[in-house]
Each structure stands twice: as structure tokens, then as C-alpha cells.
Amino acid sequence: MKILLTGATGLIGTEVMKTLAAAGHQVTATDRKDGEIPPGVEFILGELTDDNFVNSLDFNVDAIVHLGSIPQPFDDRDFEVFDNNVSCTYKVFAKAAANNVRVVVYASSLSIYGTAFSKPWTSPEFAPFDESLPLHHYESYALCKEVNERTADMWANRSKTAYVGLRFPFCNTEKAIEDHAIAQRDGHEETVTVAAKILWGYLDVRDAAHGILAILAGNSTGSHTYNFTAPDTTAPHPTHEMLAKFHPKTKVLRDIPGYGSLTDCSRWIAAYGYHPVHLIDRKKLGI
């Protein structure tokens, strides 16, 4: 399959690029910074903010994996985050439709629900939560994710291209996820707070990459977004205890046994059948 990958040297993109190449796909990868490029991958350095650069890319491909964006908000560049992430995504989506690309897979985020970066402490209305959880935006990163999802809807209406958005949690390497869990275990105050705000969710980048492979192998149509997380948490205590302590106002819809995730990914599993396999080893980490 001929694939265009944006954000190729970022955290998720690096693993996706490696996984796509290993699976035998013909990959053209682009990003604003250099990185380690697997054999057989064509890498093009450039900025998606530059219209001339975007126009120079070959969009005559079977699929696009769009991961190119500023990955989190900062107060001193709130507008820059929104402008970059929305305009670059619009360009890629429009080019996909114009070139009859079969499917576009793009990175959305669980931060779309508003808890991750909100200044006031914010809790989900209910848990486990599926994609129907109301969205509450407090900064431009969460807002741009919703705008991008609606942009995908529009282009799906106007073309035969399918758009699949993945609402990723904290997505990182095995080592970084382990360190995050250990810091919570050891009571590191900042990490404990951050983990509670992101609802203790995580996904290993290897699972992110194989989830994307599952989409590319499928027969997607229209525009859809999915929660996509590991089935457990990084928390040092059972989920019901963590909810009671940090999110006591959240309505618990059903029992969440043990260290089960607050995120309901059943729609994702039903659509593509991929279950994350790179899970934290609690015995190893002593949690």
C-alpha cells in the first residue's frame, strides 16, 4: 500500500513509520524535523504550514496517516496551537479528498473531553465513558481536536474518502509509561495530579502503530472517531478508589473491576478488533 505519513519523526510517528515499513508498505514520510528513517522510507523535510510545501507532496496514495501537529497547549502560544493544528489538518484532509485517497487515519486525543489541560479541576460526567461523553474545552488544543473531527465529517460528506480519528490517551514508549506509573506509586505530586487529570489512561506507541495498521487493513467508510486506550490504568490503586479520591462527582455507570480503564473502547474493538497487548507489568513495577 502506498502511504503518506505526516508527523513522521514525532513520538507516535516514529513508531508508526517503523511499523508501516516493516509491514512492507511503500511509505513517504514528512515532518518539520529530521529523525531516524527506516530503510526504504522516503523522507521529505518540510512544514505543513507552508502551502507550497504541501502542494509539492504526492497525494496520489492509497492512505494518509496524519500525525503532524503541535502535541500539547501552552499559554504563550494558544493561538499558534490552534492555527497550526487546524489549518494543517484542513489542508491534508482537502488534498486527500481531491485525490480520492481511500482512507485518512488521524490523531485526535482524549484531551478533547477537557479534563487534561483545564485550569479548573474538571471531572468526566460519567465513567466508564464512551465517545458520547460531553466535550468541555478550556484551551485551544482540545478545541482544535473537535474542529478537526468536524472537518473530517465535512470532507467525508463531500468525497468518498474515509476519515478515522483516534482519541489517543497519554501515548508513549514502554519506559516512559513505566516511569509515569512509578512516579505515581512514589507519590510524586505533579505526576499524581497530571495522571488524575488524564484519567490514568495510557497507550504504548507500539499498540498505537498496530491499531493504525488495523485501520489500513480494513474497509472504512465515512467519518468516525474512536477512543483507543489500554484496558487498564497507570494508577497505583484500583480504579474505584482513584475515582472516589480525585473525581468523586463522576457518576459510575457500572462496576470497573480492579485497575480497569475509565475509557470505554468497545466501539473501537467492534470496528477493528485490535486489543492493545503492550500493557504495564504491575508485579514488575511494584504497583
Residue positions per predicted region:
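N-terminal Rossmann NAD(P)H-binding glycine-rich loop of SDR-like oxidoreductase domains
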Residues: I3-A23
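NAD(P)H-binding glycine-rich loop region in Rossmannoid oxidoreductase-like domains
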Residues: L45-N84, K95
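Short alpha-helix in the Rossmann-fold core of NAD(P)-dependent oxidoreductases
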Residues: F82-T89, F93, V105-S111, C144, ...
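Catalytic helix-loop patch of NAD(P)-dependent Rossmann-fold dehydrogenases
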Residues: D83, K119-A162
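Conserved Rossmann-fold NAD(P)-dependent oxidoreductase catalytic core, especially the SDR/UDP-sugar
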Residues: K91-Y138
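Flexible, glycine-rich beta-alpha linker
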Residues: Y113-G114, S140, R158-I182
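Alpha-helical substrate-binding/gating segment
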Residues: E174, D179-T193, I198-T225
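C-terminal substrate-binding subdomain of Rossmann-fold SDR/epimerase-dehydratase oxidoreductases
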Residues: R206-I287
